[in-house]
Amino acid sequence: MMNILNKESNRVLVQGLGRDGSFQTQKCIDFGTEIVSGVHPTKAGDNFNGIPIYGSVEEAVKKTSPDIGLIFVPAPFASDAIIEQIDSGIETIVCITEGIPINDMLKVNNYILGKNVRLLGPNCPGFLIPRKKLKVGIIPGSIVSDGKVGVVSRSG
C-alpha cells in the first residue's frame, strides 16, 4: 500500500455501479477521491455525476488510466471482476463484495500468484487516507480527521 502514499494522485475505477455501488461511490467522491471511471455492463455510455461508465474494465483502463480498482459487483461475478482488473493492469484492487464462493477465491488466489498486484478483500471495508483525501471503500469519512494515520481494513 506504500505506493499509494507516495503517489501524487490516485485515480480510481469503480466496477459495479448498481444501487449500493453508486451510493458508496458518491461517498468516496464527497470525501475527495478522484473517481475517473465506472464499469457496468448495462450502463455503458452513461455517466455517474459526470464520470463516464464503460462496458468493460479494459475499455475504462485504456481511456482513463486508473491506478486503483474498487469492486462492488454481486458475489457470483466478483472473482471474474477481480481477474478482469488484474488482466487490465490495475495493480491495487479493493473488493468490497462479501459471500464470494470459496472455490472462486481459490481460483483468484492461484491466478494472482506471481503478478504485481495487491488485493484487499474480498469482504472488506477498504481503506481511507485522510491527508490524501482518498477513500476507497465503505469506511465512513466522517470518523476520521486529517493527520498522519490512514485506515486499512481487510475484513468486514
Predicted regions and their residues:
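General beta-strand structural signal in soluble alpha/beta enzymes
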Residues: S37-H40, I93-C95, R118-I129, S153
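Rossmann-fold NAD(P)-binding glycine/threonine-rich loop
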Residues: E98-L120
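Generic hydrophobic/aromatic pocket-lining and core-packing "Φ" positions
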Residues: T25, V57, I82-I86
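Short, ordered loop/turn segments at secondary-structure junctions
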Residues: L17, V39-A44, P76, T97-P101, ...
